[in-house]
Amino acid sequence: MNADREHQCDVLVIGSGAAGLSLALQVAQYGKVIVLSKGPRSEGATFYAQGGIAAVFDESDSIESHVQDTLIAGAGICDEQTVRFIAEHAKECVQWLIDGGVPFDKEEDSDNDHPRYHLTREGGHSHRRILHAADATGMAMQTSLQDNAHNHPNITVLERHNALDLITEDKIGGDANKVVGAYVWNRNAEHVETIRAKFVVLATGGASKVYQYTSNPDVSSGDGIAMAWRAGCRVANLEFNQFHPTCLYHPEARNFLLTEALRGEGAYLRRPDGSRFMPDFDERAELAPRDIVARAIDFEMKRLGADCMYLDISHKPADFIEKHFPTIYSRLMDLGIDMTKEPIPIVPAAHYTCGGVMVNPQGQTDLKQLYAIGEVSYTGLHGANRMASNSLLECVVYAWSASQDIIAQLPNASMPESLPAWDESQVTCSDEEVVLQHNWHELRLFMWDYMGIVRTNKRLERAMRRIQLLQQETHEYYSNFRVSNNLLEMRNLLQVAELMVRCAMQRKESRGLHYTLDYPDQLAESGPTILVPEK
């Protein structure tokens, strides 16, 4: 094999957000790590996370309270053992971030020897327990983790490298249930490379790009879920896609999120005529969980035929708004919206994939040597609805847990033998990229219409028929033409879209983020929706 097309490492981490970099930094003391980043390192979802990270730092708060709030938000199908595991390890994992240089906001009267962090409150939380860095927590975390990874001699970050597929050991005459590496598309050189590794970690994020309106960056195309499924891993709860209630409605600002902390600090949701509507839907009003708020906004928009609703914090002092929400204030001013004086136009947008690849408390999947952490995984934490600021927490707790498991096994793990090169001998360069673009837009539009905030059996059946048609076209395309970024993402999004719809079809009730007009009630007993790939 061409030497520059084959790499090897102790641990291959696919994804460079909070989960991937946190794990890489912890295992790099014990072995060589390669981290793959689809685009520039700051392009993932972590960078755009505004709100914060939940952990019990206040004496009036308790781990039990964090557990109970999470279980309530998850609408009865969280895994309580997982919820407890994460809540109990939250403080030490957040402290690891602080020790690594993440500049969480402190109280004004705090001193360096005994820092007191400014804690905010968001929907579903009964106490103030959200640590944050102004309104750009994800950016602060990502920047700190990136700098630490960049300076670590045992970590190599390969930017603009997309994983195509996992390689199982049966490719070299071994165990089909053991992962030994991955085929990777080098977007700079435009060729496929092979990376073999003792352990592979999926930290690829979610799949919200499957929807027309999303708060996520362009890289959120479900790659890890699709690759794990093709390799033989079970997935769960993919019917539960969280729609963030408040994404800015503006032609020049696609996917700009307006953090939940705005409502936590007193912002109201209003109709175009200025009247509030959340008290009509839930006694918690604007502080109700996201699924309830998103559905209320969707209902009011459809009822009134309105393009958007409005988020209004202008009744708060201007200096309070500018201090607590500097990023949002600045961005809105650039767009001609002064949030200290006028309401902000908003719509719901696909935001977070609550289901994913099934893992145990150490992040292990069904395949040996393969781990999944962060949004790509299904741990049981989120149940039918994710509570605000639990996602960054899940990233760092599972990064820690998986890293400990990998570190314990590294001394006895052997490097896989040389792997077969990617075969491009039967394919040609594409002359029909326009076909992919057309299929791409079609998929995102019908997923929004048929698999969106409100569903029916008929809508799900229509979505599945169209997915199968597009899968057939994309399979032919994949068989005949060389790899491209659009082709890889289209193939993966179609796979994940199919799994989402299959999960939704299996759930004969409305629960949390899954709301269907054909089964509007919640069953007395329920559990996760689990899909098993055919061997």
UniProtKB/Swiss-Prot annotation:
One Pfam family in the UniProt entry: FAD_binding_2
Cofactor descriptive note: Binds 1 FAD per subunit.
Membrane spanning stretches: none
Catalytic activity: L-aspartate + O2 = iminosuccinate + H2O2
Main location: cytoplasm
Molecular function as annotated in GO: L-aspartate oxidase activity; nucleotide binding
The enzyme's E.C. designation: 1.4.3.16
InterPro entries in UniProt: FAD-dep_OxRdtase_2_FAD-bd, FAD/NAD-bd_sf, Fum_R/Succ_DH_flav-like_C_sf, Fum_Rdtase/Succ_DH_flav-like_C, NadB, Succ_DH/fumarate_Rdtase_cat_sf
Active-site positions on this chain: 290 (proton donor/acceptor)
Residues engaged in binding FAD: 16-19, 38, 45-52, 223, 375, 391-392
GO cellular component terms attached to this protein's record: cytoplasm
Cofactor(s) required for function per UniProt: FAD
Keyword hit for Oxidoreductase: yes
Cell location: Cytoplasm
Keyword entries, A-Z: Cytoplasm, FAD, Flavoprotein, Nucleotide-binding, Oxidoreductase, Pyridine nucleotide biosynthesis
Class of this enzyme: oxidoreductase
Keyword Cytoplasm: yes
GO biological process, one term: 'de novo' NAD biosynthetic process from L-aspartate
Site positions (Important in orienting the L-aspartate substrate): 122
Pathway entry: Cofactor biosynthesis; NAD(+) biosynthesis; iminoaspartate from L-aspartate (oxidase route): step 1/1
Function: Catalyzes the oxidation of L-aspartate to iminoaspartate, the first step in the de novo biosynthesis of NAD(+).
NCBIfam families according to UniProt: nadB, PRK09077.1
PANTHER family cross-referenced by the UniProt entry: L-ASPARTATE OXIDASE, L-ASPARTATE OXIDASE, CHLOROPLASTIC
Family: Belongs to the FAD-dependent oxidoreductase 2 family. NadB subfamily.
Protein name as annotated: L-aspartate oxidase
Lineage per the UniProt record: Bacteria, Pseudomonadati, Pseudomonadota, Gammaproteobacteria, Vibrionales
Gene that this sequence comes from: nadB
